[in-house]
Amino acid sequence: MSKDIRVRYAPSPTGLLHIGNARTALFNYLYARHHGGTFLIRIEDTDRKRHVEDGERSQLENLRWLGMDWDESPESHENYRQSERLDLYQKYIDQLLAEGKAYKSYVTEEELAAERERQEVAGETPRYINEYLGMSEEEKAAYIAEREAAGIIPTVRLAVNESGIYKWHDMVKGDIEFEGGNIGGDWVIQKKDGYPTYNFAVVIDDHDMQISHVIRGDDHIANTPKQLMVYEALGWEAPEFGHMTLIINSETGKKLSKRDTNTLQFIEDYRKKGYLPEAVFNFIALLGWNPGGEDEIFSREEFIKLFDENRLSKSPAAFDQKKLDWMSNDYIKNADLETIFEMAKPFLEEAGRLTDKAEKLVELYKPQMKSVDEIIPLTDLFFSDFPELTEAEREVMTGETVPTVLEAFKAKLEAMTDDEFVTENIFPQIKAVQKETGIKGKNLFMPIRIAVSGEMHGPELPDTIFLLGREKSIQHIENMLKEISK
């Protein structure tokens, strides 16, 4: 590439890190690292009403958890928060006012609302009508004096070139253009509280920080012509823009909504449930981008090497919880036991299950986990007297040979000494039941598994029985025999 790559992730500290924002950060990170460029974090905190205490720390902490690092941020550089850059914004506001490219607007919220209502009733497209339209200089001066005397604080609006065409070649979408007359009229670049609006401040920041490429969600497409107007007004070259497609819920086909509480959408949620960060990183990196081929599991280093902005998808990215869980399970299965056990300890401790067998239990169920918090429901059988059965499990236990199998296996366990009760001796006892009763296959193994564990599927049965212990295994079988005899 001919110019230095400088990209940014610029969150507002208004809450937890959403998976859509995490994707924006991740694609900027991969783009910078692939091209040997600079990835920076800037905090856009001009919306004081939505500001959340500790929101900035939460954003950075969750990005680090995902495995991202950055070259510049408020932690290492001054004035990387918009609230620290107000003097810079004011400098360019004053410049545009002096050049007649912006003006102070004294129209009130009530007047704006009344005009919007009139336009709606008339079937007109909502837009701001310049309040000075048709005024002479004397009338304009009198209007301003009257408004200021009434204590009305003005906003500052950019004078829009209604006949202008604002176009760019989007890295993802291709050629896009807007007519200046379709923007909604002159728009506010400075609010009454002195803070700049987003579409003004972001241009000043990107220019000042020499951002070369702006990669973000396609909900920002409508913002781009306004930003191009500011670049034009200040005589600056705009960066390249790339707008990633939205993320949809794979089950509903609708845009992923933060209000959909049935879907985990915040990185903090995945951390709390015990997903591995590498798995979440991997999953997010494939939301709207893929390297080609059939493989879907890649390390961070492989993603950096493979990342190609030309493969950013033009179609919506499907958020598929089942795919994330499959991917997470793959990472957990292949992680070392020490890592997963350390992650499981808080869950086990809270449930009162951090016993001397805890690490063995984690080892036993690690291949089944989609998230580490599942260690609790998976190990319920070790801490209860009778497992809850599903309809399918109850149906299996109504088989006419079930009591015969359970009585025979219970007798085998009772006959074993403590020294004999080891994992490798348990399967031969099951085979002995088969030989004595003539019952085999599912009719043999399934009743024993369900009676002991309350599950139709799970780890190797001898491993489960050994960890459960001889006495508790016998107790579970006795409880099941009582249940099925009712």
Curated annotation (Swiss-Prot):
Binding locations of ATP: 258
GO biological process, one term: glutamyl-tRNA aminoacylation
Keywords: Aminoacyl-tRNA synthetase, ATP-binding, Cytoplasm, Ligase, Nucleotide-binding, Protein biosynthesis
Motif ('HIGH' region): 11-21
UniProt short sequence motif 'KMSKS' region, positions renumbered to this chain: 255-259
Signal peptide start and end residues: none
PANTHER family to which the protein is assigned, alphabetical: GLUTAMATE--TRNA LIGASE (PTHR43311), GLUTAMATE--TRNA LIGASE, MITOCHONDRIAL-RELATED (PTHR43311:SF2)
Record protein name field: Glutamate--tRNA ligase
Lineage: Bacteria, Bacillati, Bacillota, Bacilli, Lactobacillales
